[in-house]
Amino acid sequence: PELLLNKEGNTIRTMTLAGTQARRDDSNYIWGKKELEEHTMTGLHIENNITKSKGEILSKNENPYTIESGKVAHLRTDYIFKTPIDFNLTAFIKTLHPTPAVGGLPVANGLQCIAAHEGYDRTYYCGIIGETDFDTTAKLFVNLRCMQIGENKIAIYVGGGITSASIPEDEWQETILKSKTMMEIIQPKIPISILH
């Protein structure tokens, strides 16, 4: 799962984790316009919501950096911000989530489009998981790349960040790469046939 936020007292850590490519053996990543655009859009969403909540950004790395996870690498920007005295965690979560990675931008239009065209219930996919006391502490994650285990099937849920610069075949390959990490966990134990 991707960190949505980690709250300790009046300090919150969050991140932009957007922009994906295949993991490289040499760690020599070159990020394209599409991945940088995707990362920037998600970052602006986070920063706008910090500002709306009257939060004070204490720390933000100057440029996104690369992190590796499973078969892929992502662009990441970290934020630490101080909450105001009248900060409402529940209200902030509702403005921060769904993130552009989950619902697109503008969020309301993106969610309407997903509801009209996606064709299935996401259940826990893209939901929020974690722990909080809704006052001083919270450690919450966006449930991306998850699986649902049924009696005779396993459904793996992954997605891709689609922008106007996206190439459909590249997005499809990204989802295959993301699913391979989860497949490697279960495939040695369970015979699997893959349906696309």
Residue spans for each PLM region:
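An anion-binding catalytic pocket shared by soluble metabolic enzymes
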Residues: 1-41, 136-159
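Contiguous alpha-helical scaffold segments within structured protein domains
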Residues: 13-116, 187-190
